[in-house]
């Protein structure tokens, strides 16, 4: 099977919530010599983007999101050990990534993938999980004031995305904004939104998120 055919089948497995098929294809891709990064960026991530766009357009609903998440998990169980083998040791002081999904949002497909990719690129990780209060993010950032920190938040829904603006406002109120970098992602998040709320960056996918995070933490 040609690489592109495998990538297309992986994308389709995410979109159709084919959990067993996604795991099988992931292993086949590895066996064919395809790198874990290519499997993620060219096969799995496009499927996640389609799912996110469909959810934003109300073409699918939470149960389908959860099943696609399980398909992604089945792939990541296979890929994470492979990513660990090729883990990039970060330069001294690469920093701590505090990752979280916005309050009111329980999807974690992209969140888990971004967290994995950040860890594979040398970041220390503090994963706060899903449905995280802005207050919790503020508390964790305040505890570590003076360290190199990047906040990496995810939101799949427009309603939960709005909390990102509140978080940025709170960071400024608490005099924490200058001590952290802020990157947000998710289907509704755009460059325009990032500029509007005064954050530092967004990214199209998990691999790009890791590159962007490394760049803005230099």
UniProtKB/Swiss-Prot annotation:
GO terms for biological process: homocysteine metabolic process; methanogenesis; tetrahydrofolate metabolic process. GO terms for cellular component: cytosol. SMART domains: B12-binding_2. It comes from the Archaea. Keywords: Cobalt, Metal-binding, Methanogenesis, Repeat. InterPro entries: Cbl-bd_cap, Cobalamin-bd, Cobalamin-bd_sf, Corrinoid_p, Met_Synthase/Corrinoid, Meth_synthase_dom. Methylcob(III)alamin binds at residue 107. SUPFAM superfamilies: Cobalamin (vitamin B12)-binding domain (SSF52242), Methionine synthase domain (SSF47644). CDD domains: corrinoid_protein_B12-BD. Acts as a methyl group carrier between MtmB and MtbA. Can form a complex with MtmB. This is Monomethylamine corrinoid protein 1. The lineage of its organism: Archaea, Methanobacteriati, Methanobacteriota, Stenosarchaea group, Methanomicrobia.
């Amino acid at each position: 099977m040609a690489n592109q055919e495998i990538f297309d089948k992986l994308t389709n497995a995410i979109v159709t919530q084919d959990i067993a098929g996604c795991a099988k294809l992931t292993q086949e891709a590895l066996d064919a010599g395809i790198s874990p990064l290519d499997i993620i960026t060219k096969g799995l991530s496009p499927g996640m983007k389609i799912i996110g766009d469909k959810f934003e357009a109300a073409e699918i609903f939470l149960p389908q999101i959860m099943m696609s998440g399980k398909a992604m998990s089945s792939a990541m169980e296979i890929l994470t050990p492979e990513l660990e083998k090729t883990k990039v040791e970060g330069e001294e002081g690469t920093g701590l990534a505090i990752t979280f999904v916005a309050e009111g949002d329980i999807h974690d497909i992209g969140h888990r993938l971004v967290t994995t990719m950040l860890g594979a690129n040398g970041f220390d990780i503090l994963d706060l999980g899903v449905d995280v209060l802005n207050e919790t993010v503020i508390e964790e950032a305040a505890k570590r004031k003076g360290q190199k920190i990047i906040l990496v938040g995810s939101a799949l829904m427009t309603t939960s995305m709005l909390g990102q603006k509140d978080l940025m406002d709170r960071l400024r109120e608490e005099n924490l904004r200058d001590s952290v970098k802020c990157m947000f992602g998710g289907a509704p998040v755009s460059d325009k939104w990032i500029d509007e709320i005064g954050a530092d960056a967004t990214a199209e996918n998990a691999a790009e998120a890791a590159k962007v995070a490394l760049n803005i933490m230099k």
